[in-house]
């Protein structure tokens, strides 16, 4: 199963890099490249095809970043069904197909080589990366963890919403004091768009406000990276 996930990521990455040299990767541009019409829709994004009429419906009512991710997912599924991609979900794993194409969508929109190049150039400034790749903060943060050793924390209205680490790195249950200071500073400066950087004994921490706040939720995204030698 792990091989299938890697194959999906590799196919999506190859597709993105074949058409884009820098972010953002645009799924609708890719669809048009393959001659697939885009049909604006007020309902859920989906695709359908028959022998002569492939078509991708794009949900214009969705939050824009979510709509891009959904379009990437549907495009990969459609290109696979049409035989443009060297990828297929085995019948016995059909119940995992949605998760697989979600995984592929993340790699399509944030192909590893482009993400690493942009990340290293900007010292993994999530604010810059989010603007460059035009994806949600959570999707970006989770993908960044595949390429840099760090702990990602998302805080909503002062409470931890999720906390995850890079593979092989332990996820402490509680926030480090440096993380807490960065979070507190981000909320104190709200709605300033600037990030808050804090250097602790063992961690380099940076916190970004997610603006504008949505539905009364003030979200702060925190990336904590071990200091060299730890």
Model-found features: residue ranges?
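Active-site hotspot residues in diverse enzymes, especially metal/ion-binding acidic/histidine motifs
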Residues: 1-230
